[in-house]
């Protein structure tokens, strides 16, 4: 999907500065197109969600202003919640709260998406690079790769949980770093916990962070 949609997007007004399919030892891209996208910054991850929406004939989610008239396709724009059509049927990044609920798969008190113990058969971690997506069993909600392989950008600016509203929080209104969840192929076991949190400057891209598109 990444290469096909990216090619279409680049001829339809989109611009991406980052992104590659998977990573092998040494940092190069994987030879298989079934690896997760990595080396993608937050801005490009958001734009890709819009591109995938339009490619599939769905309503895009992200706009450059609160008026929601111009679809976000290029440049660096620090979007606010008002720039998001939360009711659109297109793709977007999950909020941090949505990500954790989906990752837990209905098990609210467990360390990992599958339980409290971690084995090599559960997820890809402490490895030399990415692997094919969906190589490991799904959790109780049918979600795969919520832990390991590629960490995932979330919508939210990073902030204290105390600042969140109780229902369907979308994170702080402003910030300097965006939330990253899930742990990756390079993490040790602690980074794969459902509650583990990380954050990065949204313009940054590296070989451990990718994205997961979600929709209503």
Question: For each of these PLM feature ranges, what is it?
Answer:
Residues 1-17, 36-53, 97, 148, ...:
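A short glycine-rich, aromatic-capped structural motif
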Residues 10-34, 128, 193-198:
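Short glycine/proline-rich turn/loop motifs
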């Amino acid at each position: 999907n990444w290469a096909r949609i990216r090619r279409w997007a680049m001829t339809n007004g989109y611009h991406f500065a980052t992104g590659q399919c998977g990573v092998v030892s040494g940092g190069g891209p994987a030879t298989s197109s079934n690896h997760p996208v990595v080396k993608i910054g937050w801005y490009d991850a958001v734009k890709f969600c819009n591109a995938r929406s339009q490619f599939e004939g769905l309503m895009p989610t992200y706009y450059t202003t609160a008026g929601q008239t111009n679809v976000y396709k290029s440049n660096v724009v620090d979007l606010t919640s008002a720039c998001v059509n939360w009711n659109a049927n297109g793709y977007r990044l999950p909020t941090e709260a949505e990500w954790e609920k989906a990752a837990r798969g209905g098990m609210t008190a467990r360390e990992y998406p599958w339980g409290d113990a971690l084995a090599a058969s559960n997820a890809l971690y402490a490895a030399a690079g990415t692997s094919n997506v969906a190589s490991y069993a799904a959790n109780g909600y049918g979600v795969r790769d919520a832990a390991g392989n590629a960490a995932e950008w979330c919508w939210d600016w990073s902030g204290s949980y105390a600042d969140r509203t109780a229902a369907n929080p979308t994170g702080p209104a402003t910030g300097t770093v965006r939330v990253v969840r899930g742990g990756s192929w390079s993490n040790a076991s602690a980074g794969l916990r459902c509650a583990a949190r990380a954050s990065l400057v949204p313009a940054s891209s590296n070989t451990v962070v990718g994205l997961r598109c979600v929709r209503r």
